[in-house]
Swiss-Prot record:
The gene is phdK. PROSITE patterns: ALDEHYDE_DEHYDR_GLU (PS00687). One of its GO terms (molecular function) is 2-formylbenzoate dehydrogenase (NAD+) activity. This is 2-formylbenzoate dehydrogenase. InterPro entries: Ald_DH/histidinol_DH, Ald_DH_C, Ald_DH_CS_GLU, Ald_DH_N, Aldehyde_DH_dom. CDD domains: ALDH_PhdK-like. Belongs to the aldehyde dehydrogenase family. GO terms for biological process: phenanthrene catabolic process. It comes from Nocardioides sp. (strain KP7). The lineage of its organism: Bacteria, Bacillati, Actinomycetota, Actinomycetes, Propionibacteriales.
């Protein structure tokens, strides 16, 4: 499976015990660049999920008994093998998700780097002694057993590969739920991983979320779940899981992230940061971390908006396998319709389209293409200012005072990221302290730094990832006391 023309003939499978699982039904996957049929994948049922979990339990027992450095060595073997398949995984995500292949190569590289960082943390899995008495008291970190990772469609390979690293390093086996819309790289990951990892240690399940995903969440032998996706689905997972067992659940959910540009900021860098932070050229704005609200001080608003419009209008939209394309289509008809509806609501409430707003030129009639869009004169509290669009739509809001900027930034249910642009170091610290976000950048867009905890507050999630916090979260702490006399 190395070229686009093989999609029709390649049979995608869920592997259990080293062979394809006999899944009764399949469902179609569409090509976002044309809107037409691409391929079909297994649509796993509850019984299929249970079969995978039972196989995974057997694999975990031996894996969890290995010393952490031995697990790290195996993880690095996997990293080396995945690197050999870099172009294949980038192509899969480009075709399956509509994302520019150049950016998907970056996604593969980022995933492998983060996996390597988790391998580096092997010896940090030790516990500690606590001198609370003359006896010996110590803690150890022990794996949960079988854990589940449920990925999102917008960074398919990155969320598959990098998000299984911490659970595996911690000694767990992993059931990986492939995204409904973009399952191909997750399925291929399991095929490649089977060449170096113990059998059934990593099993990818494909299928509709309402059946396969729900079966994973409700399975009584999966006690740890990590989910990336929408806030509504995150709440559903919490409800479903609570009905069957007490489970440890981490959630990286939606965002309506603000970039706050003060009058004393480097306005050129702020404009660049606003456009880059929107992830137009990575995922067509389909990112929980997209900085979709640009808050600009009234004294510099015209200047900043003009530069943002210039930058956005220069983005080349085209087919994902075109090396010159900087932005591809949206992943599905549903995502396209959601963005178009949001733009319409914004206009209805008084916003003005200053860039994009419709279908870009030169992409033909097929596919779910939408030009990168900027809306000015967006009112705080309006539909488009409050709701996560998950598309290429940037809203510009004007503020007059620091207090007003903070109030607008905090006036949504989300709290994932925020950016503060200012040359005043005191203001930078004060605003960063006041904004309600789990990840704050000063004079920066939306870059992740691997090793730093990343996670949201409010309705943006529970828990932190990409860091030691993520690794430890896939263990349970055991305290032991040895009475010495």
């Amino acid at each position: 499976m190395t070229t686009p023309r093989k999609f029709d003939e390649y049979r995608w499978n869920v592997l259990v015990d080293g062979v394809p699982l006999n899944v009764e039904s399949r469902y179609p996957i569409s090509d976002p660049s044309t809107g037409r049929y691409l391929t079909q994948v297994p649509d796993c049922a509850e019984a299929d999920v249970d079969r995978a979990v039972q196989a995974s339990r057997q694999a975990q027992a031996e894996w969890g008994a290995l010393p952490p450095r031995a697990r790290a060595a195996k993880l690095r073997e996997l990293i080396t093998l995945l690197r050999e398949h870099r172009e294949e995984f980038a192509m899969l995500d480009a075709i399956d998700g509509g994302f520019p292949i150049s950016m998907m190569r970056n996604d593969v590289d980022a995933a492998l780097e983060l996996m390597d960082i988790f391998a580096d943390m092997a010896l940090d899995l030790g516990g500690k002694t606590i001198p609370v008495s003359t006896n010996l008291h110590f803690t150890t970190h022990e794996p949960f057993g079988v854990v589940a990772r449920i990925g999102a469609f917008n960074h398919p390979f990155f969320f598959a590969a990098s998000k299984v690293a911490a659970p595996l390093m911690a000694g767990n086996s992993v059931i990986l739920k492939a995204p409904d819309q973009t399952p191909l790289s997750s399925l291929r990951l399991a095929e490649v991983a089977a060449e170096v990892l113990p059998q059934n240690l990593l099993i990818t399940i494909s299928g509709r979320g309402r059946v396969a995903g729900r079966a994973i969440v409700r399975h009584p032998q999966i006690k740890r779940i990590g989910f990336i996706g929408s806030t509504d689905t995150g709440r559903s997972i919490q409800r479903d899981a609570a009905e069957v067992a007490v489970k440890h659940i981490s959630l990286e959910l939606g965002g309506k992230n603000a970039q706050i540009v003060f009058a004393d900021a480097d306005l050129e860098q702020a404009a660049l940061g606003a456009v880059n932070g929107m992830n137009f050229t990575w995922t067509a704005g389909q990112s929980c971390g997209s900085t979709s609200r640009l808050l600009v001080h009234e004294s510099v608003a015209d200047q900043v908006i003009a530069r943002v419009v210039e930058l956005v209008s220069a983005i080349a939209v085209g087919p994902p396998l075109d090396e010159n394309a900087q932005m591809g289509p949206l992943v599905s008809q549903a995502q396209y319709d959601k963005s178009v509806h949001a733009i319409g609501e914004g206009i209805r409430e008084g916003a003005k389209v200053v860039a994009g707003g419709g279908r870009p030129e030169g992409v033909g009639e097929g596919g779910w293409y939408l030009a990168p869009t900027v809306l000015a004169d967006v009112r705080p509290g309006s539909f488009i200012e409050q709701n996560e669009i998950f598309g290429p739509v940037l809203s510009v809001i004007i503020f007059a005072t620091d207090d007003e900027a903070v109030a607008i930034a905090n006036g949504v249910e989300y709290g994932l990221t925020a950016s503060v642009w200012t040359s005043d170091i005191t203001r930078a610290h004060l605003i960063a302290r006041r904004v309600e976000a789990g990840y704050v950048l000063v004079n920066g867009g939306s870059r992740h730094y691997w090793g730093l905890p990343f996670g949201g507050v409010k309705s943006s999630g529970v828990g932190s990832e990409e860091s030691m916090e993520e690794l430890i979260s896939y263990t349970e702490t055991k305290t032991t006391t040895v009475v010495l006399g």
